[in-house]
């Protein structure tokens, strides 16, 4: 009895589960089916009431199982829509999270094994889908749209979209153009651009709910997990997601913030309205929208489906309205007018700003530099580098485009730069032109400086001895017409004799094979009208006879003008091109009178006051400049032959004496004693070049002869400052000797320019030549040098003939080599002790050889190279050689003259009478001396009057034996 009332208490338990299914409380609905223990409790409670009868309990149990399965199915349908909306919107917009009661942690939605923060924002928009069921209240299709609202734009902002080509399109104008054809457009959608449209739909069921619904629902739930995971992943691959992420990083305009709305898909849309999702916003071949379906998930209530339609291009931006309008105007005439023939300005590179006379002949399609002429006379149009033509062409390859011409400039354009003519034609044009600008002197060069294949000079100026540039080397272009005109530096003759601003120095180098142009100032010296002289003797006559072209030493060029690139030859093509372009160049100069603008020239060139002050200061230095020019002229005349011959010393190290100054190997410009741009070379004799004084005898003979006749012979004891006072006042410097393969037994005297006192003896009456010792030290008493020898020869020429007749046989049997052999074989202690004081002892340079340079080494001498290059001998030298040697052969005369210059000819025998035997009897030498015996026998025959071909052959043999034919193939420098 007690159990029946208790059993009646749980009997209404199956009625509790339907209570949480009320539509007004969602949380209770979700909590009730989530706890299966409630259902089990009800079943157990129902199982306890079996006693009333089997029929009522079976029907109630089946009804309870059906209601439970249906409740779970309804929960799946509800969460199917809400979870899809949560996944889609969480990846597009920022949703505020919802919190549990009494907790600060956000509530997490874990349905379908995808954890997302739950939010209360979607409760109201999704209410119809949260309260739906599978039988009575089926859910309508859920449509979620993401869009951009243009109402947040200001008046000067426009929403634009970039097409596949990068062109901007105004979205509002595109929509307005599309809505113009619509009868009733939705006003709410006028300013909205739909990006995506998601559709979540539950299809109609084909049959009634199955009886085993509870066993089918777990399978439906597992299939939905796969669907929602794919939805979560694919939603982050669409263009709208990339657009939203970019906006979050850049924090762009509020108009670019993605918005959303939830729409009932069952509401029919008016066909006349414009769909802002499929409306094309730009012209192009790309597809406007695309559709993706996630498949169908079968359920007892019907098929579940998720589908998305999205814009393929979501590259939206907010631009300024005026900028967008300006860009349209700039490209408005692209397709309006297109000429049938191409314009000439298309292929014309680097237009130059400025006006040009209409009659100027335009060059049709010039190349990158318009270079003409040979490598020696290189002219170009464009930026100049001052280097070789190859380097200039290489640098012009990367030249950038010039400044665009203004709108008011004529269509006819200038070439990239002016063509600067070269040669005499350019000089005539500079003198005859009526331009206010000073003409730059033209430059040409002597052909084939040694070596003929010269390397290109460096781009940079030489770092040694350079004076700073005081004036700019180029005239600025693009200036206005009301600019100041630079005043001429001097009076009427300013075009021919400009005043010097800064003199540049040329640096000599024995290693460099090509001259590098030294920087030249804007204004040259007022003495630049004087003719310059190259130091080479062979080029002097050519310089004197050249009428049209100035030599390289007397010419000036602007730094970086491209004219001093290669000091080789003057090409006939460049001269012809200069003559053809003179008229055009003068017209261009007349039209460019407005180049000297104060705005640009002030930063480049000094003002007129500074220029005038500098010119006035340098005008006062004309006297010192004249004295300097005269001093340089004398010193260069003295060293012309020695300097010119030094360029043949290719195997000599850089600092070896005799190669200190060279015109062809200087890195700077060629030197001249008459131009202020050449350095002042002091008259310092080097050791190698002091052996040859061909030019000293040639140029200073008339100035020395009166002094020699009036001075007594005892004055020869004076130094070189007394004898050579008119020529030079500089002393000699001790330059290190050249490298040699044998250790020298004696040190060579450094009496190159300083004249040592001449020690006279009794033999001077017979041998008037002061013999110079080549083996004495610098501090020891040396014999008279070659200058003193020549002076004694000049003063005692009349008394010399009898002495030469007496000394003929002695000289024929003696000589420098004979003396050296005798000294090596017979020198004893006293003889060695007196060797330094004996003025007639000729000691060899090497103790065990015939001397330095006799196997071809003498060709390095500046005297022999000067003769080989064609240095002319004066007639009185040839006559003196014939009187002394008694032969008229050209070979003997040349060799005798060379011996006189070397100080090695007609050496006395120091009082000892030696027989004419072969010198091999005295001491075994390093080289065979048979050649010298034959030459001495021929010389003996020549002394007795044989002046025929035999003497000529013997003289040639003697010269070859003394000049290095003794042992072929041996060279002391090798």
Curated annotation (Swiss-Prot):
Assigned GO CC terms: Atg1/ULK1 kinase complex; cytosol; phagophore assembly site
Biased composition (Basic and acidic residues): 21-30, 703-719, 877-886
Low complexity bias (residue ranges): 451-464, 491-521, 790-800, 848-873, 887-896
Keyword Ribonucleoprotein attributed: no
Any one of the GO BP annotations: protein localization to phagophore assembly site
Pfam families from the UniProt entry: ATG13
Location in or out of the cell: Cytoplasm; Preautophagosomal structure
Biased composition (Pro residues): 11-20
Major subcellular location class: cytoplasm
Similarity section: Belongs to the ATG13 family. Fungi subfamily.
Summary of subunit composition and partner proteins: Interacts with atg1 to form the atg1-atg13 kinase complex.
Function: Activates the atg1 kinase in a nutritional condition dependent manner through the TOR pathway, leading to autophagy. Also involved in cytoplasm to vacuole transport (Cvt) and more specifically in Cvt vesicle formation. Seems to play a role in the switching machinery regulating the conversion between the Cvt pathway and autophagy. Finally, atg13 is also required for glycogen storage during stationary phase.
Official protein name in the record: Autophagy-related protein 13
Organism from which the protein derives: Penicillium rubens (strain ATCC 28089 / DSM 1075 / NRRL 1951 / Wisconsin 54-1255)
Lineage, opening ranks: Eukaryota, Fungi, Dikarya, Ascomycota, Pezizomycotina
Gene name in the database record: atg13
